Amino acid sequence: MDLIFDSLKGLFNKNGYRLFMVGGTSRDYLFGIKISDYDFATDATPNEVEKFLEVDSTFEKYGTVKYHYNDRKIDIATLREEGEYKDFRHPSFIKFIKDINLDYKRRDFTINALYIDENYNILDPSGLGVKDLKNRILRIIGNPEERIKEDPLRILRAERFCLEYNLKIDEKTKMAIDNNMDLLELINEGKIGEEKRKLNEIKRKFQYEKCKL
């Protein structure tokens, strides 16, 4: 059980909406480690969330609002579909939806596409997330080549997750990463800097590489 999730899910349910743990939150929860970053998904739009919760709506146009719970910053994302990525980072359009079976397709890796509902049921729309979590496999969702070209920062995230959680990279995912390493040179430093910082923190923490890309 998680205190923050329990506190917010009741508020969302009271207002007629669903709330799910997702991404790094559900991944860390299922690995049994302390949750560091809180990511929730909901069928409420940002405008609907703002009616009953005081949030930072800076990134509202991307379908995400931020909520401060004591000293914690929580990302609350509306379930959505996304168009093609034009700038290696942002989709050409987003469409708000109600179905996690569509929302999961925009996420990066199968272990990050596990949804935990209000009753702590594990929902695995990709059909591979639970299996990959148990076997510690990092697998990209969809066509690996297309998904890496969509957002090359997934290359750095893959290496970070592999190191941090002692994961093995799926063969097709590894091949797509190897084929597209040069795309990182096209990303401006502002966008790539935060991912590099997180990766370097993990490398310093472990002082050795469990996964070399």
Place the predicted regions along the sequence by residue.
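Catalytic cores of the polymerase beta-like nucleotidyltransferase superfamily
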Residues: 1-213
